[in-house]
Amino acid sequence: MDTETGGLDPAQNPITSFAAVVLDFNTLKEVDRWETYVKPYNDLQITKESIQKTMVNMAEVNRGMELNAFIDAFMRFCTQNFADTKGKDQRRLVAVGHNVMFDVGMLEAAFYYSAYGKKQSLFNYIQDQTLDTMYLSKMMYGLTGDEKMTLGATCERAGIILTDAHGAMNDV
């Protein structure tokens, strides 16, 4: 999963877009995908720097989902894709992404700012343990921390062509 945001601080900057892909862990085949823009909410600011870095189309963002509709759709997406096939328990999504705790923090703040406030938790839908491709890359390539750890640099090391970075679905 990936979020694009109006800045780096969940208390001051909103999510502007979100994307997720569901994979079958046995076959690694895509099961579902979802991408959406999210309208700015709670008077949070979208910085000029984030607009330049992500090249976000503000017209698309302003036509995006309202925050409460986004949270409702996120919960539905998780539930329909991760419900136990026997109907006993709802399993929770394993959040996978590059520097994924940033995305988790942004989603957690969005839940808080929504009409659900503290009544509904992001962690009812995703596990509190994540799989971070940035850390996997460090381990796989024996990196010490001084190297560039962006998604683009990681893809280059792995021989993956990353086009249009900072588009939520492209980064997934």
Region spans (language model):
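A generic structural signal for secondary-structure junctions
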Residues: 111-116, 141-142, 156-159
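Conserved non-catalytic scaffold segment of RNase H-like nuclease domains
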Residues: 1-108, 152-161, 166
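Short alpha-helix plus adjacent loop in nuclease-associated cores
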Residues: 128-146
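Substrate-recognition/cap helix-loop segment adjacent to the acidic, metal-dependent catalytic center
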Residues: 103-129
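Juxtamembrane/interfacial segments flanking transmembrane helices
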Residues: 147-151
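Acidic donor-binding loop at a coil-to-helix junction in glycosyltransferase catalytic cores
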Residues: 170
